Amino acid sequence: MSNDSSDNQIRRRHHPVLPKGSFQKKDDSIVLEQELSTPKQVNQARPKFPSPITPTLPEMHLPVGNSKFQAVLPSLISPTLPPGFGMASDDSEASLAENDLHPLDNDSTRTSKTLKNSSEVLTASKLTDEGNSKPLLEEGEVAVSSPILLDSKDVIMGVTKSSKNLVEDAHKSKKASTNSSINNMVSTVNSENSNVNNGSSLNGNTSSNLKRKANVTLGDYKRLKVKNKNPSSQELITADVDKTSGSLSEKSEVNHASLKKTYMRLLNSGKMQKKECDKKGKFFEAYAVDAVLCYTVAFHLQNLSNLSRNHPATTSNWRTLPAYIQFLIKEEDKLDPCIQGLFFLLLGIAFREIFHIEVMRIRHSQLNLMRDIKESSSGLTSAKSLGDAQNLCENAVRLYSSYKHYITSMKKGSSLLTIEYISSTAPNTFNEFFVQKKANIPLPLDIDAPIGVTIRFSHNLLNEWIKKQGDVFESKLLKEDIENLQSLEESYPIAQYL
């Protein structure tokens, strides 16, 4: 018996099984739970985030063409909220300008506009010559008691002040309109008043169904007040609109065919310079820097072309640069500090553009989730909502990774390309960008400097460094390409889309 019990203990100790009904004791269950639990090393393992170079998320499939969802979904590069998330206040000047530019053509709006201009003319025209305070009503006519404000200082909810003020207002309105328009407005009001019950009084002490209900908003009052206060306000608004439309038309006149040719030419130039770098000549690293410069300008031109056509940006091209640059700088001891600094500077540009595009995507996914949460009462149950939530989480991981690499690369490049080193190695470049630079152009080593400024600085520094080394080098990147890039950056700054 003793041997059997010992065998059972050994078997139970080395081969744990689930407890049966007869062994459901408190101590035994605790021991068995500890033996069958997951090891602590598995729980403490860190999750493996995706690499910042290789994309792990498929591209989002947005509706193409004239879809019914096109008006609801916000643009990938537009930070504005869709129309369902908020309403513009009537006090804002933007809403006033929009109402002036896009009037409605329905009957109720036309009626309210004629009432605003003709009510004071009709009231003033029926005053007596002796200056009586009460207007004279002809037979068969009924006074309209509507809450239309002729002026905030003269009339409050249909109750007039004095006949003198009304006469002055009538003279002002007569100067602003012709006699034919006044007759048309008066006839319009008389025809509309004929439909009102004859039992209504002047002060409006009648039933609610007999009162005239005008379709007037606060924006109409404010437009009338601004027009009376400043007659040239409408001209100023139209001038601003013409200026804005002119700038939009200039922005839309981008020669996309020429940009495509430049893009293809720079890609071929980058491939040629990469082949020269692979030959491992005397200054092979200079060809590698020129190849990266050609690729960077080509990819940024493609980005700006997409922004000008309101197309979504892509990171597929930008993600190929970090792997190539990191392959070139893996042996940092054999490279000159100038070449190392330029490599890290261009690496920071690539990660910064990836960061900007991920910001646009994460904002787009956030707006989609906000819309789904607002529309659905049972929560995020659809497959599209769950997909947007997954995209949001994965974009957040890639956003943090690209930002970390972007900051690290820019700091590394700035530490290598110091002011003392640039002034001693390339004095002409130093005088152009640090001594005689314009006030509105940022420094090329700034963490948020435009790509055009950084590319021009890198191109000049590379050519001057090659000349100092006594070597003959022909760059495939033209100055016209850099100037074209800078002009497009001024028209479409990336900051306005973030």
From Swiss-Prot:
One of its GO terms (cellular component) is super elongation complex. GO terms for molecular function: transcription elongation factor activity. GO terms for biological process: transcription elongation by RNA polymerase II. Residues 35-44, 111-126 have a biased composition (Polar residues). Residues 99-110 have a biased composition (Basic and acidic residues). Residues 1-48, 99-134, 190-209 are annotated as: Disordered. It comes from the Eukaryota. This is Uncharacterized protein C6G9.15c. It comes from Schizosaccharomyces pombe (strain 972 / ATCC 24843). The lineage of its organism: Eukaryota, Fungi, Dikarya, Ascomycota, Taphrinomycotina.
